[in-house]
Amino acid sequence: MERHYILASHGMFSQGIYDSIRIILGEKKHVHLITAYVKDGQDISDLIKETMKKIPTDAEIIACTDLFGGSVNNELMKYIGKKHFHLLTGMNLPMLMNLFLFSDEDADKLIRRLFTEAKTGIMYC
């Protein structure tokens, strides 16, 4: 099954973090970026619907958002009942690096790995 990734955020965060991924890991396939509230009059619901239309209906989707409870995350929560749709929040660079480095893993196993390793990526130096 083909896997697609949605990186969605308030402002340009998703674009910036994906730029970092490209520098470190190279270009990745099937990545869709949603940068909400960048242009006046943008409707987050419409942006998400447009993105979902670009993804094959039988594809697996892993969506990552910047903030739990934020409008971007809340709009994507409407898709939680969709088959093979996974929604993660608290998007950060180590999380996304692991998402792409271990992209061949089963989604459930991969998501468990992401959360386990994300906890060790936050440190006080």
What do these predicted regions represent?
Residues E2-C64, F68-C125:
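N-terminal loops that bind phosphate or other acidic moieties
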